[in-house]
């Protein structure tokens, strides 16, 4: 264990919470101390759900450890059933409660509760949140789903979307639209908005559409084995992947692969005038494996970007990410340490980051534009509007999301370049007022002060700005370098000056460093 200010994944019982919160008629009884009771905060503040998560805690205290904590669990479990009357109950322990080894599953089985009670064995000190969600959904499906007659019409189950997922709500609607265009019905969507009764009907579908392997691949494999239902392997994120997804579903279900491309604008926009100064931009990708794999191919094949680094935080998918990295001829970063991610991004010096909420913070620190492509995300990535990532509309949304940081970044660079111009400096009036604009002050014509938005300082103290003095002329010239490579230029210049034994960086030093590293 280690102390950190950020984690990409919580303990596995958080994954179980996400499944329980996504479903209806299911209740989660969690054996946990007071400090582990944060589900309400996760789902009502961040995801802005209009109801509290169906989680009941035993909330034992330190003084209870010398008494019967197992008895506390049994009382809590019975009270939860009496109050909420769920169709099924899942029981488990938090990472802290796991240490006292009360066996919530075994205790619940002795209580004669008249609904299915599904025990969860989630090893908190070996696995993490995505494993918890995958294992929880698998145990629910294993306990409730059975083989049955197929529906008369061709139908599929959509499995994988859950609470706190990145655009899961909107992705469901987009995937449904793709299926309806081919005349394929939807039998059950699970776990999102499904009840335990719905889970018992999973076996009636002809196939399963697996939206997010992180959360439902174990369940999909189980249904394939027990119910004879094949499942899709293609994730429809991006134009090419959506075409492949439609073809795969059509083949599994034996229907014609019909497509309505009238809503698709991304290919035209990516070929438009805007793209002439976006092609070849260097991007770094990090997030969950599903979204990183999709984003890497979109970046290279549909946007014309150059992928300079990629990685994921969920080690269960490390092998596939390493294979992808070999395809792109870049190193694979498999880590859940945000400091390692920041170091890799700083070393790669990309022009844009595609990542999670943490990469958004890293981008701000390093002065690099960032677009969010993967959970974990904060409240701004649970929009009220329709904003999918999958399907045709998802391709449009992705184009806007990725391009706008670059466009606005270029605009910001132009503004900073011309800030000292006699016509555009901060104290000049609106340019369309002509001769009525006030004259620039002497200070505005010769600004010596440094902008408040400082460039990120490098980590290495021997080459950092704490031992180097930048003269005003060199500082002003440095600001003319685009912000997305300015940090690298600063570091190279300071390293060059340190190698030359210089304590001050003049305009000549800057030019000499540029010539040195251009060789």
Swiss-Prot record:
<dbReference type="InterPro" id="IPR042298">
    <property type="entry name" value="P-CP_red_C"/>
</dbReference>
<comment type="subunit">
    <text>Protochlorophyllide reductase is composed of three subunits; BchL, BchN and BchB. Forms a heterotetramer of two BchB and two BchN subunits.</text>
</comment>
<dbReference type="InterPro" id="IPR016209">
    <property type="entry name" value="Protochlorophyllide_Rdtase"/>
</dbReference>
<keyword id="KW-0547">Nucleotide-binding</keyword>
<keyword id="KW-0411">Iron-sulfur</keyword>
<keyword id="KW-0004">4Fe-4S</keyword>
<dbReference type="GO" id="GO:0046872">
    <property type="term" value="F:metal ion binding"/>
</dbReference>
<keyword id="KW-0408">Iron</keyword>
<keyword id="KW-0067">ATP-binding</keyword>
<dbReference type="GO" id="GO:0016730">
    <property type="term" value="F:oxidoreductase activity, acting on iron-sulfur proteins as donors"/>
</dbReference>
<comment type="similarity">
    <text>Belongs to the ChlB/BchB/BchZ family.</text>
</comment>
<comment type="function">
    <text>Component of the dark-operative protochlorophyllide reductase (DPOR) that uses Mg-ATP and reduced ferredoxin to reduce ring D of protochlorophyllide (Pchlide) to form chlorophyllide a (Chlide). This reaction is light-independent. The NB-protein (BchN-BchB) is the catalytic component of the complex.</text>
</comment>
<dbReference type="GO" id="GO:0005524">
    <property type="term" value="F:ATP binding"/>
</dbReference>
<dbReference type="InterPro" id="IPR013580">
    <property type="entry name" value="LI-POR_suB-like_C"/>
</dbReference>
<keyword id="KW-0479">Metal-binding</keyword>
<dbReference type="GO" id="GO:0051539">
    <property type="term" value="F:4 iron, 4 sulfur cluster binding"/>
</dbReference>
<comment type="pathway">
    <text>Porphyrin-containing compound metabolism; bacteriochlorophyll biosynthesis (light-independent).</text>
</comment>
<feature type="active site" description="Proton donor">
    <location>
        <position position="274"/>
    </location>
</feature>
<dbReference type="InterPro" id="IPR050152">
    <property type="entry name" value="ChlB/BchB/BchZ"/>
</dbReference>
<feature type="compositionally biased region" description="Basic and acidic residues">
    <location>
        <begin position="445"/>
        <end position="456"/>
    </location>
</feature>
<dbReference type="GO" id="GO:0036070">
    <property type="term" value="P:light-independent bacteriochlorophyll biosynthetic process"/>
</dbReference>
<dbReference type="GO" id="GO:0019685">
    <property type="term" value="P:photosynthesis, dark reaction"/>
</dbReference>
<dbReference type="Pfam" id="PF00148">
    <property type="entry name" value="Oxidored_nitro"/>
</dbReference>
<dbReference type="InterPro" id="IPR000510">
    <property type="entry name" value="Nase/OxRdtase_comp1"/>
</dbReference>
<keyword id="KW-0602">Photosynthesis</keyword>
<dbReference type="InterPro" id="IPR005969">
    <property type="entry name" value="Protochl_reductB"/>
</dbReference>
<protein>
    <recommendedName>
        <fullName>Light-independent protochlorophyllide reductase subunit B</fullName>
        <ecNumber>1.3.7.7</ecNumber>
    </recommendedName>
</protein>
<feature type="binding site">
    <location>
        <begin position="409"/>
        <end position="410"/>
    </location>
    <ligand>
        <name>substrate</name>
    </ligand>
</feature>
<keyword id="KW-0560">Oxidoreductase</keyword>
<dbReference type="Pfam" id="PF08369">
    <property type="entry name" value="PCP_red"/>
</dbReference>
<feature type="binding site">
    <location>
        <position position="36"/>
    </location>
    <ligand>
        <name>[4Fe-4S] cluster</name>
    </ligand>
</feature>
<keyword id="KW-0077">Bacteriochlorophyll biosynthesis</keyword>
<keyword id="KW-0149">Chlorophyll biosynthesis</keyword>
<feature type="region of interest" description="Disordered">
    <location>
        <begin position="426"/>
        <end position="465"/>
    </location>
</feature>
<dbReference type="GO" id="GO:0016636">
    <property type="term" value="F:oxidoreductase activity, acting on the CH-CH group of donors, iron-sulfur protein as acceptor"/>
</dbReference>
């Amino acid at each position: 264990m280690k102390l950190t200010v950020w984690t990409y994944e919580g303990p596995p019982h958080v994954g179980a919470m996400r499944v329980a919160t996504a479903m209806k008629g299911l209740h989660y009884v969690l054996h946990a101390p007071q400090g582990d009771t944060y589900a309400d905060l996760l789902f009502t503040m961040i995801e802005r759900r209009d109801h509290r998560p169906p989680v009941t805690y035993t909330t034992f205290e330190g003084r209870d450890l010398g008494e019967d904590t197992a008895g506390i669990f049994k009382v809590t479990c019975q009270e939860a059933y009496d109050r909420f009357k769920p169709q099924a109950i899942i029981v488990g322990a938090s990472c802290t409660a796991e240490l006292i080894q009360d066996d919530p599953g075994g205790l619940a089985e002795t209580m004669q509760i008249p609904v299915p009670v599904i025990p969860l064995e989630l090893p908190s000190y070996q696995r993490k949140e995505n494993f918890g969600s995958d294992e929880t959904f698998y145990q629910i499906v294993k306990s409730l789903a059975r083989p049955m007659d197929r529906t008369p019409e061709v139908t599929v189950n959509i499995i994988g979307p859950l609470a706190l997922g990145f655009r899961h709500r909107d992705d469901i609607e987009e995937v449904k639209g793709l299926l309806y265009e081919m005349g394929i019905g939807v039998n059950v969507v699970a776990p999102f908005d499904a009840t335990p009764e719905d889970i018992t009907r999973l076996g009636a579908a002809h196939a399963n559409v697996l939206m997010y392997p992180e959360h439902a691949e174990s369940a999909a494999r189980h249904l394939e084995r027990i119910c004879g239902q094949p499942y899709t392997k293609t994730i429809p994120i991006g134009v090419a992947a959506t075409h492949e997804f439609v073809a795969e579903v059509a083949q599994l279900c034996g229907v014609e692969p019909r497509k309505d491309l009238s809503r698709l604008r991304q290919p035209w926009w990516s070929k438009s005038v805007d793209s002439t100064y976006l092609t070849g931009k260097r991007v770094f990708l990090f997030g969950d494996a599903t979204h990183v794999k999709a984003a890497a191919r979109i970046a290279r094949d549909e946007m014309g970007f150059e992928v300079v680094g990629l990685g994921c935080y969920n080690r269960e998918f490390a092998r596939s990410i390493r294979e992808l990295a070999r395809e792109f001829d870049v190193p694979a970063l498999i880590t859940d340490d945000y400091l390692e991610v920041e170091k890799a991004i700083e070393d790669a010096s990309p022009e844009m980051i595609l990542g999670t909420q943490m990469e958004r913070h890293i981008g701000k620190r390093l002065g690099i534009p960032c677009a969010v492509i993967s959970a974990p995300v904060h409240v701004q990535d649970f929009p009220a509007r329709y904003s999918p990532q999958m399907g045709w509309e998802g391709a449009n949304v992705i184009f806007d999301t990725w391009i706008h940081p670059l466009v606005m970044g270029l605009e910001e660079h132009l503004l900073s370049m011309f800030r000292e111009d006699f016509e555009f400096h901060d104290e000049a009036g609106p340019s369309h007022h002509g001769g009525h604009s006030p004259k620039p002050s002497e200070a505005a014509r010769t600004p010596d002060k440094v902008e408040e938005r400082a460039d990120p300082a490098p980590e290495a103290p021997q080459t950092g700005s704490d031992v180097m003095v930048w003269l005003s002329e060199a500082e002003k010239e440095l600001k003319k370098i685009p912000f997305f490579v300015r940090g690298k230029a600063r570091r190279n210049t300071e390293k060059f000056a340190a190698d030359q034994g210089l304590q001050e960086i003049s305009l000549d030093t800057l030019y000499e460093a540029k010539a040195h590293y251009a060789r």
